[in-house]
């Protein structure tokens, strides 16, 4: 039997994006973050860069029988972090987010360097590049990338396995 501590974990972004497989289910809205949300996230990272740790919010998941983690809340942030890691071309990064029953989005996320990709991903990558690089040296950008992976944390909460997901948000 799991205790409350087993359901709530604090993870670095590196741990979040390199350990488990996340599934974005069909009931989640499409990825929709635009320039405003992305610029705010990246500006928050630049502002927090000199802190020991920075908490970026939460992710709520349901663990499926096969071990995959179904994202209940936080998919916009998770997808944006995946896009940022792709942009950074981190050597340790392996894509671990999939879109269930959305082949166009899933295929695009699988190969973000291909063409064409959905405009929402293309625009997000442009925004990431713009706000990551604006008035920054290469050393500053590399330092922020390291900070993001090792010092930025997210609280991941797993709902109990007997949770009725149809009634979770009621």
Q: Model-found features: residue ranges?
A:
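Glycine- and hydrophobic-rich flexible loops that cap the catalytic core of alpha/beta enzyme folds
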Residues: 1-170
